[in-house]
Curated annotation (Swiss-Prot):
The C-terminal domain displays an autoproteolysis activity and a cholesterol transferase activity. Both activities result in the cleavage of the full-length protein and covalent attachment of a cholesterol moiety to the C-terminal of the newly generated N-terminal fragment (N-product). The N-product is the active species in both local and long-range signaling, whereas the C-product has no signaling activity. Cholesterylation is required for N-product targeting to lipid rafts and multimerization. GO terms for molecular function: calcium ion binding; patched binding; peptidase activity. This is Sonic hedgehog protein. Belongs to the hedgehog family. N-product is active as a multimer. It comes from the Eukaryota. Zn(2+) binds at residues 91, 98. It comes from Tanichthys albonubes.
Length: 121
C-alpha cells in the first residue's frame, strides 16, 4: 500500500507574490473571464451561499487551525456586485475570494497565502 507522505515545509509567500506568478485575470491563473454574474442571471443560482455564522470558511483539512490553534480563516469578500473591482474581476463571477485570519494578524498572511495555494486556490 502507499506510504504516508511527510508534510512538506510551507514557505510563506512574500508580499505581492502570486502563485502562479501571473496576474489574477490571465489564462494561466484563472482561465477565461466568463462575464459578471448579477443577482438576476441564471449563473447566480449556481453560486453557493454560506449563511452559517459559526462557519467562517470551509477548511476540511483544518489547515488554519493546525497552523494557528484557535484562529479561523475569515473571508472578507467573495462574490460581489458593487463595482469596486476592476471591470473583469473574478469577484463578479464568484471565482475570487479575499481572506484574512480571525485575529487579523497580518504577520500570518504570507503563510496563509501559501496554505491557500496548497489547498488549490
Amino acid at each position: 500500500y502507499g506510504r504516508r507522505r511527510h508534510p512538506k515545509k510551507l514557505t510563506p509567500l512574500a508580499y505581492k507574490q502570486f502563485i502562479p506568478n501571473v496576474a489574477e485575470k490571465t489564462l494561466g491563473a484563472s482561465g477565461r473571464y466568463e462575464g459578471k454574474i448579477t443577482r438576476n442571471s441564471e449563473r447566480f443560482k449556481e453560486l453557493t451561499p454560506n449563511y452559517n455564522p459559526d462557519i467562517i470558511f470551509k477548511d476540511e483539512e483544518n489547515t488554519v487551525m493546525n497552523q494557528w490553534p484557535g484562529v479561523k480563516l475569515r473571508v472578507t469578500e467573495g462574490w460581489d456586485e458593487d463595482g469596486h473591482h476592476f471591470e473583469e474581476s473574478l469577484h463578479y463571477e464568484g471565482r475570487a475570494v479575499d481572506i484574512t485570519t480571525s485575529d487579523r494578524d497580518n504577520s500570518k498572511y504570507g503563510t496563509l497565502s501559501r496554505l491557500a495555494v496548497e489547498a488549490g486556490f
